[in-house]
Amino acid sequence: MTTKFEATTICAVRQNGHNAMAGDGQVTMGEKVVMKGTAHKVRRIYNDQVVVGFAGSVADAFNLEDRFEKKLNEFSGNLQRAAVELAQEWRSDQALQKLEALLIVMNKDDMLLVSGSGEVITPDNDVLAIGSGGNFALAAARAMQLHAKDMSAKEVAEAAIHIAGDIDIFTNHNVISETL
């Protein structure tokens, strides 16, 4: 059985010129058992200049995070180029096509969603969210951006995860966040 991070929530926010990404800590085995409540699904890479968050199979997510960091090194930290190259490789390599994960990658200038079907998506409204609670976090973060402009990016991202955790049974309130 493969451990999945699908039952997780990651939210990235750009607010007031700052970026933050937050994720919950729950790892669920199947649909009935919480295996861990303190997993770190949001991490800094590339000399702490890039934050990556992932949802999907644990092994697949780590594999893709490692491949993405190699692409960042290959392209001297160019986030968009590294993301596009990873997406192209992911889509064209038959072994990689079987990987079940999504990545949100972010530096001080850009925020991108990278999927296994070859998409590299830049959000229209400075918020991205993935995982089982992703839609709840996305809606909450967008509402806070519109109506609570005094909140920091970190406060918005963390609050969005907490709101998702109140609704989604696969998301807990042990929030890990990183800011840029």
From Swiss-Prot:
- Aminoacyl-tRNA synthetase keyword on record: no
**GO MF annotation list:** metal ion binding; threonine-type endopeptidase activity
* One Gene Ontology term from the biological process aspect of the record: proteolysis involved in protein catabolic process
Q: What are the annotated GO cellular component locations?
A: HslUV protease complex; proteasome core complex
Q: How is its activity regulated?
A: Allosterically activated by HslU binding.
Q: What are the positions of the active site?
A: 8
Stated EC number for the protein is 3.4.25.2
| Residues involved in Na(+) binding | 165, 168, 171
Q: How does it assemble?
A: A double ring-shaped homohexamer of HslV is capped on each side by a ring-shaped HslU homohexamer. The assembly of the HslU/HslV complex is dependent on binding of ATP.
Give the family from UniProt.
Belongs to the peptidase T1B family. HslV subfamily.
Q: What is the protein name for this chain? A: ATP-dependent protease subunit HslV
Species source reads Lactiplantibacillus plantarum (strain ATCC BAA-793 / NCIMB 8826 / WCFS1)
The lineage, from the top, is: Bacteria, Bacillati, Bacillota, Bacilli, Lactobacillales
